[in-house]
UniProtKB/Swiss-Prot annotation:
Comp. bias intervals (Low complexity): 9-23
Biased composition (Polar residues): 24-33
Organism encoding this protein: Pseudomonas syringae pv. maculicola
Protein name: Effector protein hopW1-1
Subunit structure as annotated in this protein's UniProt entry: Interacts (via C-terminus) with Arabidopsis WIN1, WIN2 and WIN3.
Superkingdom: Bacteria
Localization (cell): Secreted
Gene (name only): hopW1-1
Pfam families for this protein: HopW1-1 (PF15457)
Keywords of this entry: Hypersensitive response elicitation, Plasmid, Secreted
InterPro entries named in the record: T3SS_HopW1-1/HolPsyAE
UniProt KW Mitochondrion keyword: no
Entry's family note: Belongs to the HopW family.
Biological function: Induces hypersensitive response (HR).
Region (Disordered): 1-33, 301-340
Amino acid sequence: MSPAQIIRTPHSFPPSFTGTSSSAENSHAQSPQQVLTRAFVASGELNAAFGRTSTASEQDFTSLLGTLQRELERKTLSFPDIAELANQLAEAAKGDQGGHWLGRDEQQTLKGMIDRCKSQLAHTHASDASYDPLAQVCENLKTARLHQSISQMTGEAHAKVRGVPDLLALIQLDPDVLAEKPVGMTSYVNFGSFICMAKARTAELSEDLRSDPNEVALLLHPHADTILELERLPDALAALTENCPDTPTRDDLRSLAKETGELLQQLRANDLLPRSEEVSSYQGETSVRSREVVEPKLTLCQAGGNGQGQLEASSARPESLRYAPTRAASSGSEARVPGQAVGGKIADDAQKVAGLYAEKKRTNWTQANGVAGKISHKIQSLLGMRDAGSRVQAFVAFMADGKGRPGATMLDLGDGWMRATRVIKGEAALIDFQCDSDGKVVDARHPGRFPVLPQGNEREAFKTVLQELKFRGAETLSKVPVYYVNRNTRGYVIPTHGYVVAGHPNRGRKSGAVLYGVGGDPKRGPVALDEKLLGHLVGRSDSKTSSKLSAPVKAAISALAGASFATREDFYDAYCAVRGDAVDPLERHNEISSIYRLLPLSTMEMWPKKADDYRVARPAAPERDLRAFENLPKDIGRKAQLKKVSNVDSIDLLEAKRQFTLHQLYQDEMLGRNGTGVPSADFKPKVDAQRRDQLVASTPKFQRLPPHTTDKVGNCNTGASSLLQRAVDTYTEKNNLPPEKVTAASIFGIGSSHRLAIWDPLDGSSSNKSSKDR
């Protein structure tokens, strides 16, 4: 929306439009907010909601900010000129400005200007000629600040708080547009996908605030003024839900509203939003006394010889992290440790503190020595005397004090900067710190996962690079752990369902975990309409299954009684022939899809499973399996047991799955199918009936419970253990180790002792070692 045309009143939602906007409404023209809402609903893209562009702006944000600051410092102010500059600044913020405009200096300058203009507006009478231009200046500056925060929170370093921009986007929408059913908007699929993604990110952010509030707070505190807009989110979601005509999207909006309520509670609990009794002070935007929202002052306080220290009482209070007088923005503190000194510049950039804290957490470094030290630290944390900032202070002091110590290297980067590497519990920690002429540490940072070497000092950097390769390289190239997982599924109490995952458990969606599961495929398998299957599909009138099929469908199935089809595609053609061309093709397709869902598991072939799109609200079983590993269930009704398998390589596990998938692809090509259960002109059978029967006989079938009499039947545990067993056998043979038999993670992993034959279509053989040989 164009900030120059909008004036937000303290209690209005949505914002009212002035002048040209009202005339546009009278002439049935679209307001800027309606245009952006239509574009966003159609595309589902975040930038569309804010009117942002990916192209670079003609105006440079930093230079405009400096010009506007100088104009505000003049003795005689020209508010129309200032309003025009503020409008240009807001427009520049919508384009790609690079990363320089997201620095702390630019953020503090912009927030200071907003605070100054709001204070002056509060002291200006509404009848004054300067009131309207000044109000536009405030609105445009707030718009620029919003885009500044959005740009930073959508960056890779702020991935944990990515849900906040999504929620802010929903506040910008005009809910009436949804009710109008605009021309050309035939579907709400993209909008619904965005809502589902926002809900998932909101839930993840709430969980991170519960499990690790310090790290998330460090990312959100610099944007405390922006996230205050989230107070309007419940009303915005209620309006969108009321006006949305699409039922699935409306249900997703209700679910998002529930997740949002939990998030707002967590934000208030961590003093990132005002408490309920303070909300009224936020709504009154024109208060005389203004307070500047600043980052928490994570100063580096006095540290003893062992690196321990205490925080000042003022910095330990949560309320001091959200609000501080304007003069506090430039305050800092310094302290010394023997041989080194730690200064307060690190506190000036919350992103630096977050990076250093993440490095400390990665290496599990702690000051505590023994049980007594850990108890002391726990008591200090409960009393508010230890937070992320204080731990970063001690960590920087520890790293800077490593010169000349075993397992530590120092590399001169120039301009007082040093790169320090120290071995901590078998892992190499890496930071950069800067010293002044007195040897006092005045700044520190984490150089990133792949730090750049200083130009001209490549030869001197050899020792440090060698140390990093020795520890960090080994860590980066270490083999991926493999876990056998058993969990309970819907309707079951005990964890009988089994599968294998390569990755690190309980690390969320971005952990990179890979699912290696085998299960029944409802779109692949024969259909034999014998008496048993007919009774299951048609059955009695009071049968639960038969009641799900209409009378014409039952009649068509009965007409095919006794027939046997090698593939689902053959059954599809026969069913369509019985139903005739008078029936709509889409209706016939839906009928057959319903039949496929009701076919017994015993008619399904066993193939590797694939995880679906993680953004969907109701994922299929493979995606639920992966989610249970990435976020271990905490509910009492959900159980997941893990067993780490040591003698296996994830690459061998991948090869085993590829071998199984090769069998699937070969069989699909020979039988003329594409995995959808629907015949296609592009896929025609390439074998005769005799060869087809041989292929079908070599295909493993799903059988839930033992006894599994042959290596061509099994369940999910059988498939998972077969893949894992093949990978373990490959690993033990390569490393001359004794054979090892794979077992499930739970005693309820029924079928894990049985093995499937993984057939190789290239030579016609199967890996059908008996489980007794292992």
